[in-house]
Amino acid sequence: IASCLVGSEMCIRDRFLNKSDIEYCVIGNGSNLLVSDKGIRGVVIQLSDTFDEVEYIDDVTVKVMSGMMLSRLGNKLADKGLAGFEFATGIPGSVGGAVRMNAGAYGGEIKDIIVSADVLDRSGRLISLSRDELELDYRTSCIAAMDYIVVSAVFRLQKGDTDTIKALIKELAVKRRAKQPLEYPSAGSTFKRPQGFFAAKLIEDAGLKGVSVGGAMVSEKHSGFVVNTGNATAKDVCMLTDMVKDKVKQQSGVDLELEVIKLGDFS
């Protein structure tokens, strides 16, 4: 794993993009990833927590480097009395990953607050994309399809009261702990929400709550999560998610789609 310790796109471009013989992939915090048991071929570039400068453009607009953790950014914004980011503060990911997948929770999504993002293409060209050009939709954007690397994002928020903002952040954190299986390691929400349905409800109705393969288990606390109860392999997780998808399809006719992103050789 290579970390970019300099908060600049030049770090990525000079060390990797200009060297065509190097295979690489870029990750943020890795919180929604499932890595193959065979590992990943080539270099994994992690946009570390030093790649996390914040620039205050005006009273309600900020530019943030992609390595910034959402929790850290949320608390910084709260201290400044900026509201609108509370929904994301408890998501265990980075700004880059959040933009890539249009992360969301508790009624909010990145597309609600983003103005633009600077990205690198595979040739090392820096491109600025507007909110519309990012093609943000439910847990997706053009970033993955075009294989872009998020360098930074601009968010527009609203002025608010610091104490009120922090109280909401705390309230959402309490809800998250009550509803999600945070006592076990996981890659977060495992399946995307099918249109008109809730994945967890479909999985529970199919009788799959608590079902396990090896060390991987459908959480008994929230069926939308596959958790690692101890020494689970990526193969265990894949076998279990395939079983879940098959049984839900048989039971309800709904096709579940993974929200977790697979990296590496799963052949």
For each feature predicted by the language model, list its residue ranges.
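A gly/ser-rich beta-alpha-beta helix-loop segment of oxidoreductase catalytic cores
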Residues: 78-115, 186
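Phosphate/pyrophosphate- and phosphate-bearing ligand-binding catalytic cores of soluble enzymes
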Residues: 33, 120-247, 251-267
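Single conserved hydrophobic/aromatic residue that forms the stacking wall/gate
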Residues: 1-7, 12
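Hydrophobic pocket-lining residues that define ligand/cofactor binding sites across diverse proteins
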Residues: 17, 77, 248, 252
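Acidic/His- and Gly-rich active-site-bordering loop/insert found
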Residues: 24, 33-34
